[in-house]
Amino acid sequence: MARKALIEKWKKEPKYSTRAYTRCKICGRPHSVLKKYGICRICFRELAYKGEIPGCRKASW
């Protein structure tokens, strides 16, 4: 879980656009965030297993 201060700092618009970075909308994790969904791989996996992400299913080959 990310510190609350970092999450609040991330929500504010940065002075320069290059300073912007992605964070998970659920847990605040800064790494391995899927841009399409806006959540990290860990939260994505949990939601996918629950069936809460439409059109997403486990790969099998």
Curated annotation (Swiss-Prot):
UniProt family annotation: Belongs to the universal ribosomal protein uS14 family. Zinc-binding uS14 subfamily.
UniProt keyword Lipid biosynthesis present: no
Binding positions for Zn(2+) per the UniProt entry: C24, C27, C40, C43
Quaternary assembly: Part of the 30S ribosomal subunit. Contacts proteins S3 and S10.
Species of provenance: Clostridium acetobutylicum (strain ATCC 824 / DSM 792 / JCM 1419 / IAM 19013 / LMG 5710 / NBRC 13948 / NRRL B-527 / VKM B-1787 / 2291 / W)
The protein's required cofactors: Zn(2+)
Full protein name: Small ribosomal subunit protein uS14
Keywords annotated in UniProt: Metal-binding, Ribonucleoprotein, Ribosomal protein, RNA-binding, rRNA-binding, Zinc
PANTHER family: 30S RIBOSOMAL PROTEIN S14, SMALL RIBOSOMAL SUBUNIT PROTEIN US14M
InterPro entries from the UniProt entry: Ribosomal_uS14, Ribosomal_uS14_bact, Ribosomal_uS14_sf
Domain of life: Bacteria
Pfam families: Ribosomal_S14 (PF00253)
UniProt key word rRNA-binding: yes
Listed transmembrane segments: none
Gene encoding the protein: rpsZ
Any one annotated GO CC term: small ribosomal subunit
